[in-house]
């Protein structure tokens, strides 16, 4: 198994990445990246660019940039797609499906949910899409929370596309536990996205559902891991360690000042924490 974390750190060190990540929350956390392992990098790059991203290439690695998230594409063989892993799918907001279709992508609409649909990558990954007409985008914060950033879900999308959520399919009885874990570890805002329990971080809404079928870790799947960008990552890692987190890959700093660490949540979601991704980005879209 190749080391996608090491590759990403090398990429960030060697070359600036141009993207627009969300400003961090009080704990210094925001969404950073999705890292896919694919057989055909070029075909997948064309898909993500057609969806609305901007491509770049760094020392053999490919990244497609979106508001709030970077999509990294690494060539390799995975053990399967997101379906069957703890992270069932990811989702983006778009203004209209017609704009996506005009770019040459097919959108399968859900008849019972206006404004909700999906498109598929060349290797079969389902990417959920919500247009502004969708009725189930709203995020209601739990009592005692009033976060202005989380209110973005309750307004029309003012730009062509932005990252929206990842959806975790959890074992029975684990939804409340997962919601509490992400709230505590990353200082997230708990609430409900439509009828789903959820936790909001700048740039990402984490949705939780019970799943009767067993799931596996994201490690080695096509979506190998999620990435959060963190300010003062070393101190943040020490805080997580004090809370009992065991790191798969401990905090490491590269020559150019970027840093990373990697952990797995209690249900198998592999999460890379990075620092320096934001300072290497640009507001250019």
Describe the role of every protein-language-model region:
Residues 4-16:
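Bacterial N-terminal signal peptides
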Residues 26-28, 32-71, 115-121, 167-209:
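Core segments of cupin and vicinal oxygen chelate
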Residues 79-83, 135-138, 213-218, 279-282:
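A short local loop/turn or secondary-structure capping micro-motif enriched for an aromatic residue
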Residues 20-26, 29-40, 62-65, 79-170, 192-193, 198, ...:
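Vicinal oxygen chelate
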Residues 176-253:
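Structured core of small recognition/catalytic domains
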Residues 55-56, 71-73, 80-81, 99, ...:
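Short loop/beta submotifs within extracellular cysteine-rich repeat domains
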Residues 20, 70-77, 147-153, 205-213:
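Short amphipathic beta-strand starts and helix->beta connectors
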